[in-house]
């Protein structure tokens, strides 16, 4: 495509695109007007140089313009990760989302099938009985009645099908690995956002601020997890009241025992679904601890807990009282209605 060639030529020299140039270039990519060779060369040129913040904002703008939107109540948040950490861990953010919603914070969760593990959010939720691919009206009902919905990325970002074959052929991470988490169809302004590399935390937090988010914790575990981990400390870059601050979370300071990395490894969707149900039914496992800790952080991001200690207590109570299990049961029922 001739109109795409100037953008390809510019990134091939190592120069960065402006925000508007990036938006136009990605609009071409998402429209299916670009050949696989052009798309692959463009994405790898960005990857080798490293994507600039304005390029990410522009690309996200192009994807957001094409996405199928969902109406969400005020104060709704997302708990999401980039994936790609190659940990094979349990579905931590999914269980944390259920617990958070049971505490009264609406969670408009956005996700997909597995990226680097054997079970992504969509995979485990399907194994739990949640119906995927709902339309915006049905998702709004899930939020209203269960306090939680799952927006299947394939349904809301159909334009990404044009680059899917290229991403498979490249076989490596590209900017599209982080675009999905930046483009929540419900337009939430609060996120607990896990990244696969510590170097991404501050740039992506600033990108989310540019895109309209007001409260964000971007996290990266010392073990490489794109979650708040319980095997050691987690680095946090937080956006609060228009300012960026950095701090570290140590699970031991919150009364949680350190886990071994193998304690957090999941398996296939059915195995992970059974482990998730066991936690909601009262099992005291490392999976419970890491999910409670991440839910606690989500409660702080949402303004529903003053600090992590209060958040841990609220999240644990939601599990122990059966409220979290009831939230999952409602989500299954409403999504299948």
From Swiss-Prot:
A single GO molecular function term of this UniProt record: anthranilate phosphoribosyltransferase activity
Binding residue positions for anthranilate 2: 167
Keyword annotations of the record: Amino-acid biosynthesis, Aromatic amino acid biosynthesis, Glycosyltransferase, Magnesium, Metal-binding, Transferase, Tryptophan biosynthesis
Top EC group: transferase
Domain of life of the organism encoding this protein: Bacteria
A GO CC term assigned to this protein in UniProt: cytosol
Enzyme nomenclature, EC number: 2.4.2.18
This protein's pathway: Amino-acid biosynthesis; L-tryptophan biosynthesis; L-tryptophan from chorismate: step 2/5
Gene3D superfamilies: Nucleoside phosphorylase/phosphoribosyltransferase catalytic domain, Transferase, Pyrimidine Nucleoside Phosphorylase, Chain C
Annotated Mg(2+) 1 binding sites: 93, 227
Any one of the GO BP annotations: L-tryptophan biosynthetic process
Positions bound to Mg(2+) 2: 226-227
Job description of the protein: Catalyzes the transfer of the phosphoribosyl group of 5-phosphorylribose-1-pyrophosphate (PRPP) to anthranilate to yield N-(5'-phosphoribosyl)-anthranilate (PRA).
Protein name: Anthranilate phosphoribosyltransferase
Natural source organism: Methylobacterium nodulans (strain LMG 21967 / CNCM I-2342 / ORS 2060)
Organism phylogeny: Bacteria, Pseudomonadati, Pseudomonadota, Alphaproteobacteria, Hyphomicrobiales
């Amino acid at each position: 495509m001739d109109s795409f060639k100037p953008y390809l030529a510019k990134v091939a020299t190592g120069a960065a695109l402006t925000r508007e140039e990036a938006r136009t270039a990605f609009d071409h990519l998402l429209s299916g007007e670009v050949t696989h060779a052009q798309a692959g060369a463009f994405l790898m040129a960005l990857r080798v140089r490293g994507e600039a913040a304005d390029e990410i904002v522009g690309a996200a703008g192009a994807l957001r313009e094409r996405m199928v939107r969902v109406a969400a109540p005020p104060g709704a948040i997302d708990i999401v990760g980039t994936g790609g950490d190659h940990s094979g861990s349990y579905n931590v953010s999914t269980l944390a989302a259920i617990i958070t919603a049971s505490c009264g914070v609406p969670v408009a969760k956005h996700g997909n099938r597995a990226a680097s593990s054997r079970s992504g959010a969509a995979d485990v939720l399907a194994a739990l009985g949640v119906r995927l691919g709902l339309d915006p009206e049905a998702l709004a009902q899930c939020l209203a009645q269960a306090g939680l919905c799952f927006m299947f990325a394939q349904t809301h970002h159909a334009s990404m099908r044009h680059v899917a074959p290229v991403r498979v052929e490249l076989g490596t991470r590209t900017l599209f690995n982080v675009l999905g988490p930046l483009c929540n169809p419900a337009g939430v302004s609060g996120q607990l956002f896990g990244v696969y590399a510590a170097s991404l935390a501050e740039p992506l937090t600033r990108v989310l601020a540019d895109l309209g988010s007001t409260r964000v914790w971007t996290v990266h575990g010392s073990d490489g997890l794109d979650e708040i981990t319980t095997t050691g400390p987690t680095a946090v870059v937080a956006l609060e009241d228009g300012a960026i601050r950095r701090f570290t979370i140590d699970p031991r300071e919150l009364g949680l025992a350190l886990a071994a990395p193998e304690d957090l490894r999941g398996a296939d969707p059915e195995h992970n679904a059974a482990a998730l149900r066991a936690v909601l039914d009262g099992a005291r496992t490392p999976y419970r601890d890491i999910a409670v800790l991440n839910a606690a952080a989500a409660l702080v991001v949402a303004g529903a807990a003053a600090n992590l200690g209060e958040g841990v207590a609220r999240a644990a109570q939601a599990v122990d009282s059966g409220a979290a299990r009831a939230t999952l049961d409602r989500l299954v029922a409403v999504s299948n209605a």
